[in-house]
Amino acid sequence: MTYRFKNAIIRKPNKSIQNGLSSQNLHPQYEIITEEHSNYIKAMEEVGLKINLLETLEEYPDSIFVEDPALTYKSNVIILNPRDPSRNGEGDIIKEEIQHFFDNMFFVEDGFVEGGDILNINNHFI
């Protein structure tokens, strides 16, 4: 069975993304990120998704990656807890921004996990 997405939750890029986490000590250029982000939105629209654009969060350089603090599955969302201290607080903000999209909201209160740590295959999560 295939799940058909109807909505995309996307955050506008912020200028502080240049200070985001990087394993290679890279500093992305805001102008390039903005152009790539516009193309990303166009691609989502071309496949028929409704774009739900969230405002920038300058105090959180990596907040453009909305999949890290929130894992969505059908009508459910789990607000996650990223390990890096620079991301503490993103979950509290995104839960307020997206709660109206979901029937059920759950929270990771102990331990650390972010969306990039989780793989969904059919109805199974690893």
Each language-model region and where it sits:
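The feature marks the mature, well-folded catalytic cores of soluble enzymes
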Residues: 1-126
